[in-house]
Amino acid sequence: MALPGKKKKKPFKKLTRRITRSKAAHASIAFVVRGMVAGVRSLGEERAGRVGGAVARFVGRFVSETRLARKNLAAAFPEKSAAEREKILQGVWSGLGQTMVEYVFLDKLVDIDPERLGEGRIEVVGVDQFLAMRDDGKPGIIFSAHLANWEILAVVAARFGLPVVSLFRAPTNNVIAEDLMQQREQMMGKLVASNRGATFEVGAALDRGEHVGMLCDQHHSRGPKVPFFGRPVHANPLVARLARHYDCPVHGARTVRLPNGRFRVELTPPVELPRDAEGLIDVDAGTAKVMSVVEGWVREHPEQWLWLHNRWR
């Protein structure tokens, strides 16, 4: 019997955690994932996308994220009917399923050639902005959001000769993380795992005159509170903080999923962030400005954003 005031030990739970985090477990899971990747590749791009979307919609019927998404959509779009919001939600699950299988075909999916624009599956709005960032000799920041297939952005930038140092969340499985790193870095710029040292690596890249990219639409517990769809959220202030420190251009970028397996990539002109009385970028107001841009994107294509995330806490 456990003594009063002391927690019971959970040896089975600890043992399970140790086993699942072991090298053997990581290797076994990676073996299964690699087999699944091979199976997806054998389906071909179009069929795999349809299957991925259908599977995601089916799974979505049974998970708690669907209830959260319905709650988020009702708060964000009270003017829409329940049927309209449900249609958006089905689009969210379809898009997520498609995005997951598109990882397998990312090298073929981004078939853009800067010398022959308009011939592949990727339309680009803001070619002049890509070229200006590439040639201006300045560091730069690109912010984006989890819209459509967000991985396409960095690949397109690299095709225009603009490699971007990108922040990403590494999988907990070390073997899978290494696979993804190798695959991604062959197609885009350097990847920096989002951890405690990430800010220093990103800052070092800007010191070298490079360009950095980051997704800024998810919850950040230590960030300032800013409005998002009429409600306060804790937002990631890193874009505004870096822009304040380096006084470099800030651009927004997004991917839009189009019919028939096509995409449109858009890079905005420099976004003017508010400044304080000393002429420096105001971090809180700058973060609010970034989130207002993201909100505009989401309102335009709500079915292409991840409403499954607990954004309002």
Indicate where each model-derived feature is located:
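Short Gly/charged-rich anion-binding patches and loops
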Residues: 35, 68, 128, 152, ...
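Generic structural signal for isolated residues within well-ordered alpha-helices
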Residues: 38, 72, 156, 179-182, ...
